[in-house]
């Protein structure tokens, strides 16, 4: 599993000109599920993101978690994160888990975050989406599990 975590002031995802998910201060998550991923990996990723101290305290140090700042989450499934670019010029996506299992695990991931009392907005699995966001920092982390 690979999750790109971007600290944002606000973010939204649109499909065909319609906003389907929108948040204020929090994190934008681009989520890639790979072959072999199972529920324990999803739970670990959600827990790690919930506790990761990526927000600044009053002294400007990154000591606060998403929960500490009351942040929101925008989660978007993105199989292209699992691209293999080692050979040739065309990325290979053979490592990306195929639906319906990948959709199920992405939904489980979002449910884990919601169960931890986060407000979670999402894109639509498999849809062509337009994402708008304002990075805060920028502060971006790639979580590989």
UniProtKB/Swiss-Prot annotation:
EC numbers for this chain: 3.1.1.96
Pfam families, per the entry: Tyr_Deacylase
GO CC annotations, alphabetized: cytoplasm
Gene Ontology BP annotations: D-amino acid catabolic process
InterPro entries, per the entry: Daa-tRNA_deacyls_DTD (IPR003732), DTD-like_sf (IPR023509)
UniProt keyword Transit peptide, yes or no: no
Keywords assigned: Cytoplasm, Hydrolase, RNA-binding, tRNA-binding
Motif Gly-cisPro motif, important for rejection of L-amino acids: positions: 137-138
Coiled-coil regions, chain positions: none
Record family assignment: Belongs to the DTD family.
NCBIfam families tied to this protein: D-aminoacyl-tRNA deacylase
Protein name according to UniProt: D-aminoacyl-tRNA deacylase
Source organism of this protein record: Lactobacillus helveticus (strain DPC 4571)
């Amino acid at each position: 599993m690979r999750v790109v975590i971007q600290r944002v002031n606000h973010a939204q995802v649109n499909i065909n000109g319609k906003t389907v998910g929108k948040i204020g201060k929090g994190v934008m998550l681009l989520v890639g599920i790979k072959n072999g991923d199972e529920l324990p990996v999803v739970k670990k990723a959600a827990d790690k993101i919930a506790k990761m101290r990526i927000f600044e305290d009053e002294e400007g140090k990154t000591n606060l978690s998403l929960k500490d700042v009351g942040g929101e989450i925008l989660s978007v499934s993105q199989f292209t994160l699992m691209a293999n670019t080692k050979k040739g010029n065309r990325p290979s996506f053979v490592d990306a888990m195929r639906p319906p299992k990948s959709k199920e695990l992405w939904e489980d991931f979002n449910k884990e975050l919601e169960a931890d009392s986060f407000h979670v907005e999402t894109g639509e699995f498999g849809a062509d989406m337009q994402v708008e966001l304002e990075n805060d920092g920028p502060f971006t982390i790639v979580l590989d599990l």
